[in-house]
A protein has these predicted regions:
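Hydrophobic transmembrane alpha-helices
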Residues: 1-52
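Interfacial helix-start motif at the membrane-water boundary
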Residues: 44-57, 65-71
């Protein structure tokens, strides 16, 4: 990473950690919908600084919430999913986001019965719905941001006035 990547890295780390630890919990069955998952689609714009930032943010949030050894593997799974979103950005950010949902939901389906003692079917439905809600909210934000970004890029510099 270059020096100019440090800003987005810190911002995405803070978004995940503060969003998960600082905001009220949103429960969906047995799973907590993590606000920190919302900016996952933005890795298509901000690249690996966002991938590393969200991964570190998840690690920090897990230290504050569920510090079990198995739960500490979650950032590695998340990193792989975020890297998939980044790699698929030129093909389809939505496809990358769906792959992220499937990967992380599968991991959470395995993790929740171990850490919470709930049934696998409840874990699967809770994790899938929770991840889908959070990631698709983020995808909506990404879609708006990318359209604004495209319209700003299409504006000739000569038409911009400063007053």
């Amino acid at each position: 990473m270059k020096l100019e990547d440090f800003g987005p890295f810190v911002i995405f780390t803070a978004l995940y950690a503060a969003g998960t630890l600082g905001l009220p919990e949103i429960h969906l069955f047995a799973y907590q919908v993590k606000v920190g998952e919302i900016p996952s689609a933005f890795v298509a714009i901000f690249g690996y600084p966002a991938v590393f930032g969200l991964t570190l943010g998840q690690f920090i949030a897990n230290l504050g919430v569920e510090a079990s050894p198995i739960a500490m593997l979650s950032p590695a799974v998340s990193f792989i999913g975020l890297a998939v979103i980044y790699r698929l950005r030129k093909v389809s950010v939505l496809a990358g986001s769906v792959a992220y949902i499937i990967l992380t939901s599968t991991w959470l389906t395995y993790l929740l019965p171990i850490t919470s003692g709930i049934s696998t079917s409840t874990a699967a439905s809770s994790a899938f719905l929770g991840q889908t809600i959070a990631v698709l909210i983020g995808y909506g934000g990404y879609a708006v941001a990318s359209r604004i970004r495209a319209s700003v890029a299409a504006t000739p510099e000569g038409q911009q006035t400063t007053q």
